Regions:
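N-terminal entrance/gating region of PLP-dependent enzymes' catalytic architecture
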Residues: 1-116, 402-405, 420, 465-467
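Conserved PLP-enzyme active-site core in the AAT-like
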Residues: 2, 9-15, 124-300, 308
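Conserved PLP-binding catalytic core of the aspartate aminotransferase-like
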Residues: 365-402, 463-465
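A common structural junction motif
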Residues: 398-406, 441-448
């Protein structure tokens, strides 16, 4: 083909190398919408470059959230991103897969066969906790009115340990509930069951038991809590119930410690939430909540919505969202089965125990949680340790190798205790764990041989290190 002077394809940008493009040679607008479009390959690279200096998700040992899924799961989820989970009349088979997931969880959590359990997916455990809390509040209100209690006299209250996740504080603020916090202490790094009933009155909507405290990974003694609640209920017209926040533990414990009584086997446990994107092994974000029986989910919280040609019951706080995470959850259930989950979680537990030994052998730390119940390794510096550096400095050292390992104070009455914690997930294999252990030992060596630089006129409450 012949071309004239005007046909030199000077506007054919595919001939221009990406890093020679006009977009790459000028500053992109960051807080206003740019005027002209650009090629997708250039937009992709620009966005990718903006994220380049972030941490590697696989090395983020601060998060419980899943950072790896199989390629087949990723393909399946990418193919279903456009499906709206709320459009159940348009995507009936997707709704069926969600229903299957609810039934699988009900079986895992030992829902009684003679009761009518029900449940739903959520965006994550935070939404699930909101729904669980709302169900308790509305049920308390209905029962209180029947008893003739003046529900306007004071605010209803919820009882939980100081190891709560922030979603519970949000719930109490959003829905005008008084959060009564049972403080943890050095002897009780989970809920102190003996102190719980110091906080109970007729305005208590329920008690939250935590299966995997975010700070430490420890479990509340839910079986003992259930015993105490049963004693209370036998002698009081006001009936207490227990909600289990199993964001971390409810998709782990059934596989590695199935004999532990914490779930619907306990009489007063009426609802359970979990995060599918934690030990359910799905990318963020999907959560689940189940109620033991329909009597524990007040009817006024269930809405019949006419949408896109069909009527459907819904109670979620969120509405439109992709169904891909629900489908990813069902893929995992189908792919792994009980034995697959058990093998994965047992391996993760083994990794946690190995790393806990590494921490302990260093001689610097007291282990708070060794990963035996939940693969969370948590520790603090020994009380008699005489060193200049802190756990915050150790966190900085590990970050230099890409590892994100948080250090932070415990809540409330233990706020003077600084701890460090790392989460072992399914994608932390033994070989990678060995690399982390080596970096951990190197970090300690560097801290011991660092020259301390004091700041603020010689005071040593703020300092750094040179190497």
């Amino acid at each position: 083909m012949l071309y004239s002077e005007n046909d030199k394809r000077k506007h054919e940008s595919y001939r221009i190398p990406l890093f020679g493009s006009e977009e790459e040679s000028t500053s992109i607008p960051k807080y206003v919408l740019k005027k002209e479009p650009m090629e997708p390959r250039i937009a992709y690279q620009l966005v990718k470059d903006q994220l380049m200096d972030e941490g590697n998700a696989r090395q983020n040992l601060a998060t419980f959230c899943q950072t790896y899924m199989e390629k087949e799961a990723e393909i399946l989820m990418s193919e279903t991103l456009a499906k709206n989970a709320i459009d159940k009349s348009e995507y009936p088979q997707t709704a069926e897969l969600e229903n299957r997931c609810v039934n699988i969880l009900a079986d895992l959590w030992n829902a009684p066969k003679d009761m009518s359990y029900l449940g739903t997916s959520t965006v994550g455990s935070s939404e699930a906790c909101m729904l669980g809390g709302l169900a308790m509040k509305f049920r308390w209100r209905n029962n209180a009115e029947k008893r003739g209690l003046d529900i306007q006299a004071k605010r209803p209250n919820l009882i939980i340990s100081s190891g709560y996740q922030v979603c519970w504080e949000k719930f109490c603020v959003y829905w005008d509930v008084d959060m009564r916090v049972v403080p943890m202490d050095k002897e009780h790094l989970s809920i102190d069951v003996d102190k719980v009933f110091d906080f109970v009155d007729e305005y208590t909507i329920g008690i939250v038991g935590i299966l995997g405290i975010t700070y430490t990974g420890k479990f509340d003694d839910i079986a003992l809590l259930d015993e105490k609640v049963e004693i209370y209920n036998e002698t009081n017209e006001h009936q207490l119930v227990i909600h289990i926040d199993g964001a971390s533990g409810a998709m782990f414990t059934p596989f590695v410690n199935p004999e532990l009584p914490w779930d619907f086997r306990l009489k007063n446990v009426v609802s359970i939430n979990t995060s599918g994107h934690k030990y359910g092994l799905v990318y963020p974000g999907v959560g689940w909540i189940l109620w033991k029986d329909k009597e524990y989910l007040p009817k006024e919280l269930i809405f019949e919505v006419s949408y896109l040609g069909g009527s459907m019951p819904t109670m979620a706080i969120n509405f439109s969202r992709s169904a891909s995470q629900i489908i990813g959850q069902y893929y995992n259930f189908l792919r792994y089965g009980f034995e697959g989950y058990r093998e994965i979680h047992e391996k993760t537990k083994k990794t946690a125990l190995y790393l806990a030994k590494t921490v302990e052998k260093s001689g610097y730390f007291e282990i708070i949680n060794d990963g035996a119940n939940l693969p969370i390794v948590c520790y603090k510096m020994k009380d008699d340790l005489d060193v200049e550096w802190t756990l915050y400095d150790l966190a900085d050292q590990l970050l230099m190798k890409g590892w994100q390992v948080p250090a932070y104070p415990l809540p409330d009455d233990l706020s003077d205790t600084i701890i460090q914690r790392f989460v072992c997930r399914a994608d932390l294999g033994h070989n990678v764990a060995e690399e982390f252990a080596a970096d951990f030992r190197d970090a300690l060596h560097n801290l011991e041989h660092a020259r301390v630089l004091y700041h603020d006129k010689g005071r040593n409450d703020s300092y750094g290190f040179t190497h």
